[in-house]
Amino acid sequence: VGDLRALIFDFDGTIAETERSGHRVAYNRAFEALGLDDRWDEATYGELLAVAGGRERLEFYFAGAYPERSETERAELARSVHATKRRLFDDIGPTLHPRPGVVRLVEEATAGGVRVAIATTAAPEGVRAFFAGHPTLGRAFGVVVGGDDVPAKKPSPDIYVLALERLGVAASDALAIEDSAIGLRAARAAGLATLVTPSGYTLHEDFAGAAAICNDLENVDLAYCRALVA
């Protein structure tokens, strides 16, 4: 039996629908900036989201797109594209909007003495770029753990374990909020009850093991979150 002391949010797809019109656009602009002919349409990008982490996603894609290149060359290309993409996302991030109910739930949690954190495979620059457009929301998150902070990305539980450590909260006293099956697996492996709000790219994934599945956070309040960990 838990006593809700923290909400730990995933970022991409959970706090905001960043993938389709955010990260995907930035990747395509990076390809163009580096003189590459590659372009990711919405369907292709949706399939690539099965690979967690931007650089890892690029390496996976380049293995299929450029089989004639060595693994070292492909890894270098992935690093170059990823670095360029991260810079380009700085302009896109602030224009994206939080998903329904996110701001209200974060405000309610903060007012109710429940801490809020972020545990994401996203690069910290991407999170900062988004919050540059939503500074009040950004200030509410006292703990932000990213993929660069841990040895293994989701579905490994490392990110959630570190977030709990930094919060000083037991897994039984926290609720994870995720949008993907990969994220759900990571949170569950860390011992967290998990509320899933599927995003545009994850609607058809298998969310077995979730404490609850909601279209969004519009009708989710702190009392509902408390009940999920009780």
For each of these PLM feature ranges, what is it?
Residues 115-117:
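Short glycine-rich phosphate-binding loop at a beta-alpha junction
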Residues 98, 119, 152:
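Residue-level marker of regulatory loop/turn positions in helix-turn-helix DNA-binding domains and
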Residues 1-4, 103, 107, 123-230:
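Asp-based, Mg2+/Mn2+-dependent phosphohydrolase catalytic module
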Residues 2-103, 107, 111-112:
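N-terminal helical cap/lid subdomain that shapes the substrate entry/recognition surface
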Residues 14, 120-122:
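Conserved phosphate-coupling serine/threonine residues in phosphotransfer and NTP-handling enzymes
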Residues 112-113, 209:
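Structured helix-beta-strand junction loops
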